[in-house]
């Protein structure tokens, strides 16, 4: 096993988003009046979503509610100190209402899932970051915002096509740190109901 992959397993894939990248995301977001639900299904210690919530420009009559899901017990306890509600669980084992969230902040674990698929397109879509996106994108309400932080190498043609079919007003920019070769994809969930 490659040392970098082994290190990822030791940390349970936990690599928090840097503050400069979070600031770049926050300055691009605006919320209207009303209740706004912000979800981080890989919330770690909750600091990223808490920072986003505190820096997002929002209407004075809007109420921001932060929700996190975290697998690691110690990190979930820390997250509960700065987020409104934290569930200690695997994001894949949770039931989150479809169309219930205004913002989905997603910096998922990265890497290939063990698969016997030989087809490259299927292999590309079996990556962890893709699986997290597919599982959690339905939690966004129509016109809700996805803030996805992934290595640019994960943006295979199949994954890019998946995102392009489901998002509109897409903006992509490099993360502030070059350490993981990450990009941020911001996009609004498209209306999938058809004409």
What are these regions (language model features)?
Residues 125-186:
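Conserved Class I SAM-dependent methyltransferase catalytic core
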Residues 1-33, 48-50:
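S-adenosyl-L-methionine
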Residues 54-65:
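Conserved S-adenosyl-L-methionine
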Residues 183-195:
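Core SAM-dependent methyltransferase catalytic element
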Residues 15-20, 123-130:
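Conserved phosphate-coordination/catalytic loops
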Residues 79-80:
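Conserved SAM-binding loop
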Residues 83-88:
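Active-site regions of enzymes building and remodeling cell-envelope glycoconjugates
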Residues 25-28, 37-54, 68, 72-73, ...:
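Conserved proline-anchored active-site loop of SAM-dependent methyltransferases
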